[in-house]
């Protein structure tokens, strides 16, 4: 069994964290020789701008089973007309990666004390933010300030776009027994696009998934619930592109470090565990961080999501998650988690644990 993975390290810590994820994937191959991973590296972000003048060269492969991304951006490239982040927007749009999945939970309960929330409020937090990724205000019509002191952006959604992301949320909810509740976040009291969103989500669940429940929350009240009692949102949280961008970042601090949280961006339902997807940590490129200090766990867990959702290697993906728990519980941690271990030491420990679990 051979799997083709495009690796886009990106900028700054991107190379370090993708190297550790590759190390863990290679450990799977060592434990299970029938599983082979072929890695093809390409540039993205600032590294691509420096080398080619554009943030995502056209030769980046679209024929892989999945894409593993490190991180893009940094102060060197600023906010000019050519920016590293444009590479991310381009690859999402070109590859049709319409659904961004960001789990919010604790990789280990031993990390509860690191949360900014009191342990009694944070314990048990377990939800997935499902963010619509290729529509809305980030891709709408806009006007820059051309000297007249006026600029604007437009938010546009269609019924098919909202139906598609709703079906993704419903699919994920139905993977559990009993099915998970769905929370839909919008601003329907103000925005026309949110009123269409709410109506379409409601009708899609009612007509296609009557066994599921959906509750609607205004995005501002959901933001308050998230810091006051995050377990109330346990289940599947579905929202549009901009709201999802913001609320998932808010959620990411609950487990105590951005270095822990993975993400997946999918082009189709993972109903056969073979959806094409791009996998990346939730954190940025950390340009100020010294070498070998970044936490690789988020990228390693992103690789675990890739194994389960795109590569049809569910058992191996769960083994990676279990290995991460064991390593964290053993006290092997980077500085962001109060430890003193290096990036490579954490990666080595997870790779070793994976081989032991799969032996």
UniProtKB/Swiss-Prot annotation:
Pathway: Amino-acid biosynthesis; L-leucine biosynthesis; L-leucine from 3-methyl-2-oxobutanoate: step 3/4
Keywords linked to the UniProt accession: Amino-acid biosynthesis, Branched-chain amino acid biosynthesis, Cytoplasm, Leucine biosynthesis, Magnesium, Manganese, Metal-binding, NAD, Oxidoreductase
InterPro entries: IsoCit/isopropylmalate_DH_CS, IsoPropMal-DH-like_dom, Isopropylmalate_DH
Protein's UniProt name: 3-isopropylmalate dehydrogenase
Cofactor or coenzyme needed: Mg(2+); Mn(2+)
GO cellular component terms listed in the entry, alphabetical order: cytosol
Gene Ontology MF terms: 3-isopropylmalate dehydrogenase activity; magnesium ion binding; NAD binding
Known catalytic reactions: (2R,3S)-3-isopropylmalate + NAD(+) = 4-methyl-2-oxopentanoate + CO2 + NADH
Known partners and oligomeric status: Homodimer.
Chief place of localization: cytoplasm
UniProt-annotated binding residues for Mg(2+): 220, 245, 249
Job of this protein: Catalyzes the oxidation of 3-carboxy-2-hydroxy-4-methylpentanoate (3-isopropylmalate) to 3-carboxy-4-methyl-2-oxopentanoate. The product decarboxylates to 4-methyl-2 oxopentanoate.
Cofactor note: Binds 1 Mg(2+) or Mn(2+) ion per subunit.
Important for catalysis, annotated site positions: 138, 187
Organism: Kluyveromyces marxianus (Yeast)
SUPFAM superfamilies: Isocitrate/Isopropylmalate dehydrogenase-like
Cellular localization per UniProt: Cytoplasm
GO terms of biological process kind: L-leucine biosynthetic process
Protein family (similarity comment): Belongs to the isocitrate and isopropylmalate dehydrogenases family.
The organism's taxonomic lineage, starting at the top: Eukaryota, Fungi, Dikarya, Ascomycota, Saccharomycotina
SMART domains per UniProt: Iso_dh
Positions annotated to bind NAD(+): 74-85, 284-295
EC number of this enzyme: 1.1.1.85
Binding sites annotated in the UniProt record for substrate: 92, 102, 131, 220
